[in-house]
């Protein structure tokens, strides 16, 4: 199956690269309309995935990641329209000059080629990944999780129907419907067809892709995000920020998983936070010995807890004596995604932003803002936590490469 699908997307990538900006934008706008028109059809297929998930006893938080409603489908359509309105990076000239030999050298943006996307649960990723790849002249091979197979299949069917109506080869998007681990590993090693592989999901998925893939990988989004409450922090502000980052949507990668508190305010802040957060939702605190003394309820934290992406109403807590200790702790356990400091000390804020090794570093704000739309990128294909090629929310430019065009008049060397 991988051989057949890989050849299709590889062949189609040549046509995708030739599409004009107007052709791409017109198609994305029509696809947005088509999604809304097919709302009932999509929800009907999504219901099969939801029933299967509930039958397997999956938690409601994880079921929510699968669920497609009329509003969420409308939001997906809005995302398509926003991508259509974004500037097309393909063909953008980054630099141009004439060298000492008289050669005219231009560097411009071009598509990556063929993108492989391996992801879990959220069927909206099917639309996000396709729209960004299509806008940047790439073809894409999608492999979603077995838990969202019916949703992913109907979404790809709708995309393909619209491609055929627009007289664009439908090979610019293919779905690996065999969700077995064996087929997934074949996809990870399909380097003769795929130019890049982007995994999006749990730490387990991403680590497996890194271990097995021969296709170049852009690592995304394990989100062990931490908030440090400094001694000068406004404790009301800190409480609001932590509650939002932990409880607003705990199953996403930019939710807070860990809290670090300065010892001078721990006895005042931790009871206040625990009281207020439990009014929103009961949260389990896994805390070090010093933090436990300030909490009315909690369990002892292990080293593993400080590095864990819980994706649930669980928060690890560490008390530290100073900013340097906080930075060292965060850099030790962080997944390099998003970290935040709550402080009124300008120099501590600057030091934190300078020394924390993460894709996004906040001062006095929730980590929940790390998102392609918020950062002005439109839809995102993922949030990269590595340093090569792309880092942070990955929009259109992250799905491009560059090439040099050199014009001469007979020069030799």
Curated annotation (Swiss-Prot):
An example GO CC term for this entry is: cytoplasm
Please name the GO terms that the record assigns under molecular function. glutamate-5-semialdehyde dehydrogenase activity; NADP binding
Which reaction is catalysed here?
A: L-glutamate 5-semialdehyde + phosphate + NADP(+) = L-glutamyl 5-phosphate + NADPH + H(+)
What are its E.C. numbers? 1.2.1.41
Family listed: Belongs to the gamma-glutamyl phosphate reductase family.
What is the protein's known function?
Catalyzes the NADPH-dependent reduction of L-glutamate 5-phosphate into L-glutamate 5-semialdehyde and phosphate. The product spontaneously undergoes cyclization to form 1-pyrroline-5-carboxylate.
The record's annotation in PANTHER family points to: DELTA-1-PYRROLINE-5-CARBOXYLATE SYNTHASE, GLUTAMATE SEMIALDEHYDE DEHYDROGENASE
Q: What is this protein called?
A: Gamma-glutamyl phosphate reductase
Q: Which organism is it from?
A: Lactococcus lactis subsp. cremoris (strain SK11)
